[in-house]
Amino acid sequence: MAGHTDNEITIAAPMELVWNMTNDIEKWPGLFSEYASVEVLGRDDDKVTFRLTMHPDADGKVWSWVSERVADPVTRTVRAQRVETGPFQYMNIVWEYAETAEGTVMRWTQDFAMKPDAPVDDAWMTDNINRNSRTQMALIRDRIEQAAGERRTASVLAD
């Protein structure tokens, strides 16, 4: 059995701002609440290889792994995968962005499978990722909408 999640949120902000803020990997610790640090290991055109390190969990364990992301600004999609898979057999993520009358819809689709010796199974991880994705997406929405509001205010003041 494999796990699959599909979550989306509408952000009341222009596509360009949402795209730029969510693809500025070095600033992810300020966008997501779960990441303590990001280290970019390499760049090749639209492909970025980086190490993510989370804040310690309730047991004090710090999780860290290497991922790759390939951003396509034309189709407004990002494809990512874990290079260091940890407890996963594989983990693939697709980020999709779409403009709507209300702003920008950001969608995360994750497909994965846990290793047989992982401490949790696919069903547990699916629930965990769904819960965490909703939390992180709401936080990202709030931070981007705040930045959009600050830009509107600065633009009005400059006029």
From Swiss-Prot:
It comes from the Bacteria. InterPro entries: COQ10_START, START-like_dom_sf. Involved in developmentally regulated synthesis of a compound biosynthetically related to polyketide antibiotics which is essential for spore color in Streptomyces coelicolor. To polyketide cyclases. This is Putative polyketide cyclase. It comes from Streptomyces coelicolor (strain ATCC BAA-471 / A3(2) / M145).
